[in-house]
């Protein structure tokens, strides 16, 4: 059985090379809207998406993420858009809720021909004083946990084919 959604799921790949051009507002809004329709525990919608396209803010996030990683590289791969996904730290299912948002963002991006990749270490970034100050600067008050960064842009290269699925991936009982 196949359909467009299943094909998008099977063909989505993490993109780690981006063209410098910014994505359009129409593309961005479509990806963001898909993120807001992610399933959430009891419909609480505990996640929040922060759009970062400003060069200074992108550089700050890149530096903070690299510091957590212990490297002096660009963990955002030069992507022109970073979507920071946060979740209410007091929500019982904050991490699953935010993770579903991340999945929707990446699948929506793939459906539009955009590249995306989940970049880790958001939790550690926003546990720091600098991270908490950044949230306040963005007007985000309260207790939030960083779920991930969904980087977006136009792919600079074609994606590699998927690796074969491991034979014991599924167990039917």
Give each language-model segment a name.
Residues 1-173:
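Acidic, surface-exposed loops and disordered segments
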């Amino acid at each position: 059985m196949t359909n467009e959604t299943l094909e998008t799921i099977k063909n989505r790949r993490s993109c780690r090379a981006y063209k410098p051009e910014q994505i359009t507002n129409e593309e961005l809004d479509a990806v963001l809207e898909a993120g807001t329709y992610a399933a959430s525990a009891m419909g609480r919608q505990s996640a929040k998406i922060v759009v970062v396209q400003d060069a200074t803010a992108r550089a700050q996030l890149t530096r903070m993420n690299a510091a957590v990683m212990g490297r002096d590289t660009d963990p955002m791969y030069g992507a022109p858009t970073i979507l920071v996904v946060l979740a209410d730290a007091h929500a019982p299912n904050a991490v699953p809720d935010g993770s579903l948002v991340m999945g929707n963002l990446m699948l929506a991006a793939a459906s539009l021909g955009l590249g995306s990749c989940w970049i880790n270490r958001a939790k550690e970034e926003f546990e720091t004083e600098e991270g908490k100050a950044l949230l306040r600067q963005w007007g985000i008050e309260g207790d939030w946990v960083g779920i991930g960064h969904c980087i977006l842009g136009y792919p600079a290269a074609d994606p590699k084919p998927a690796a074969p699925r491991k034979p014991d991936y599924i167990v039917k009982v």
